[in-house]
């Protein structure tokens, strides 16, 4: 079996070798054929290139010859030469042939006209000669000729009169038929006019009712606006009185603080050792880690970004601003829906009125003049009512803006006072998300009364005051909106923003500058006291 397998393998190997030899021979033959074909193609390419060059030269020569022939055919006519310069010889030849044929046709027509006129001239000359050769007529013949001409003229006049009378007779018949038809149609038109009169009367009554309703609505809106303005002015005056009282209290506190600072400065000068120890303690407290400083800078940058995005000067105003924006969005969406409904109603009314106007235009009668005058009056009344409605809408928009501003201020106060807890013996209002404006006002009023009472009852402590002042100054030192606040008169502007922004961009000194000024004053006073002692 092994010998048989080896023989079969050797036979297969020999067959494969013969196949590979044949494939190599075929490949060599293919390569030779390809080389021969490439050589033939190169030769044909050279021949074709030479033929192309010759053809291009022949084409250029033919073009030049065509241009020369066109210029020779056009002669001195530059416009024709420019018109046919870029075209081929065949196109130029066809155009010139058309031009020549047109000129030949016009020439033939003119020759024909000249011949006809010559024939007419010859006939007229012959008539002249015949008339000159005739003998002169007698008086009787002349009279007869005049009578004949008069009779011919009279006959023509009578014929014209007869034709005109016939035309008038037919016209009168047509008019009679038309008038009969119109008389037959008049009763139906009278019925239509009566119906139109009834419809117009009903529309007039409806329009009067509409105008009266609009007047009533505008009067009610004006009353509500006046009442709202009066209540707003009273509330604003009350708020301003409270703010003035608080301002007076703050001024008193500031005066006390300055006096206490002066006393402390004197004590520090009397006891320098105590001052050194206190300064060392403060320096130790101020030494903070680098991580805390980096965290504080990150927090401040984030807060500044939020403030710049929301356009608020305080952190506690951001939530109020978002709530105000939500309220304004909801109100604007409601207004948009109302406006769309009104627009659809007005479009339907406009279509109806346009249809009625078209009907009236195409069916106007002498009795419709009165309706036109009434319609003009009604249009004027409608324009006046629309102007009043626009004024009322403007007033309503102003009132809505004012209400939105008031709501934002109340929301800001509510958010500021929400963290203050009342004592147990006082009834605290439950905080809920569904509080209306009046509920928020009551809540803020209770908290503010509690805070005012607590401020009056609290005893002043120097250390606590200094700590609070230091924290406030350090927190508001780097703020851009760290400016003084001025209170405007109530008569200047009826709208209050409740956002105590940059009203008076006055200079606010820092804590270091205040310390320097205080030390300078203390040193000057001590020098004066030492000089007096000496």
Curated annotation (Swiss-Prot):
It comes from the Eukaryota. It comes from Mus musculus (Mouse). InterPro entries: CCDC183 (IPR043247). Keywords: Coiled coil. Residues 10-54, 136-209, 321-406 form a coiled coil. This is Coiled-coil domain-containing protein 183. The keyword Protease does not apply. Transmembrane segments: none annotated.
């Amino acid at each position: 079996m092994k010998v048989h397998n080896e023989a079969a393998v050797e036979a297969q190997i020999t067959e494969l070798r013969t196949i590979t030899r044949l494939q190599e021979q075929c490949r060599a033959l293919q390569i030779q054929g390809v080389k021969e074909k490439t050589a033939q193609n190169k030769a044909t390419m050279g021949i074709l290139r030479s033929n192309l060059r010759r053809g291009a030269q022949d084409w250029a020569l033919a073009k030049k010859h065509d241009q020369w022939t066109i210029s020779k055919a056009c002669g001195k006519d530059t416009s024709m030469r420019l018109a046919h310069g870029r075209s081929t010889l065949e196109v130029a030849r066809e155009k010139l042939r058309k031009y020549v044929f047109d000129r030949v046709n016009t020439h033939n027509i003119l020759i024909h006209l000249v011949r006809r006129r010559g024939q007419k001239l010859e006939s007229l000359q012959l008539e002249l000669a015949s008339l000159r050769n005739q003998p002169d007529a007698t008086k009787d013949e002349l009279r007869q000729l005049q009578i004949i001409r008069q009779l011919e003229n009279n006959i023509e006049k009578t014929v014209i009169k007869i034709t005109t009378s016939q035309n008038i007779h037919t016209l009168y018949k047509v008019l009679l038929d038309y008038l009969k038809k119109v008389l037959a149609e008049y009763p139906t038109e009278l019925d239509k006019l009566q119906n139109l009169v009834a419809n117009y009367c009903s529309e007039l009554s409806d329009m009067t009712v509409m105008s009266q309703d609009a007047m009533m609505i505008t009067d009610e809106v004006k009353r509500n606006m006046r009442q709202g303005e009066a209540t707003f002015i009273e509330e604003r005056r009350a708020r301003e009185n409270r703010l003035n009282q608080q301002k007076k209290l703050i001024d008193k506190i500031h005066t006390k603080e300055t006096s206490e600072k002066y006393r402390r400065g004197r004590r520090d000068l009397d006891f320098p050792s105590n001052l050194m120890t206190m300064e060392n303690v403060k320096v130790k407290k101020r030494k903070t880690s680098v991580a805390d400083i980096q965290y504080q800078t990150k927090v401040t940058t984030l807060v500044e970004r939020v403030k710049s995005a929301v356009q608020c000067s305080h952190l506690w105003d951001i939530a109020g601003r978002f709530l105000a924006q939500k309220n304004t969005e909801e109100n604007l969406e409601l207004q948009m829906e109302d406006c769309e409904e009104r627009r659809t109603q007005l479009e339907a009314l406009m279509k109806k009125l346009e249809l009625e106007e078209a009907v009236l235009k195409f069916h106007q009668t002498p009795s419709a003049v009165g309706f036109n005058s009434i319609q003009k009056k009604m249009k004027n009344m409608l324009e006046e009512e629309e102007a009043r409605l626009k004024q009322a809408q403007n007033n309503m928009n102003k009132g809505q803006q004012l209400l939105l501003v008031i709501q934002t201020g109340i929301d800001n106060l509510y958010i500021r006072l929400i963290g203050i807890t009342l004592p147990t013996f006082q009834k605290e209002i439950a905080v809920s998300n569904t509080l209306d404006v009046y509920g928020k006002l009551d809540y803020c009023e209770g908290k503010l009364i509690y805070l005012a009472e607590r401020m009056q009852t609290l005893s002043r402590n120097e250390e606590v005051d200094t700590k609070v002042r230091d924290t406030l100054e350090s927190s508001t030192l780097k703020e851009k909106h760290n400016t003084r606040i001025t209170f405007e008169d109530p008569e200047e502007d009826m709208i209050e923003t409740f956002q105590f922004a940059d009203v008076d961009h006055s200079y606010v000194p820092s804590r270091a500058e205040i310390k320097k000024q205080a030390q300078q004053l203390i040193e000057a006073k001590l020098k004066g006291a030492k000089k007096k002692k000496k």
